[in-house]
Amino acid sequence: METNNEKVLYTAFTKTTGGRTGTSKSSDGELDIILSSPGSNRPGTNPEQLFAAGWSACFIGAMGKAASNLEIKLPAEHYVETEIDLVSTDDGYSLQARLNISLPGLDSDVAKSIIEGAAQTCPYSKAIRDNVKTEYNLI
């Protein structure tokens, strides 16, 4: 894949078989999971949970960078709860999301500034911008 003066920092590789009722494994062996459909009684996780976990982790990293740009540190007890809805639409399926963000002890305006900065720089947030209805909520 060619890039325009971009430097690839990391490439994740997974092999998935069986779709929502299959398995997914990473090339380094660190990820080896069973997949199941949401709401089924089968063991395993689903793409929506994986997306939520990845986005939460990435967003926390982006908040750290945004806080650093403001010359402050994130509170020790910060967290992100990400909800991903699988939505049935007239033309198939789509996703919508809510990121509920806790930054205890920070002034509300400062916390909102960090969240806004992270939403602009987080690779997940950038990838879904204008395609997935997303709410960023300070809790």
Language-model segments: residues:
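Extended beta-strand/beta-hairpin segments
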Residues: 1-53, 60-139
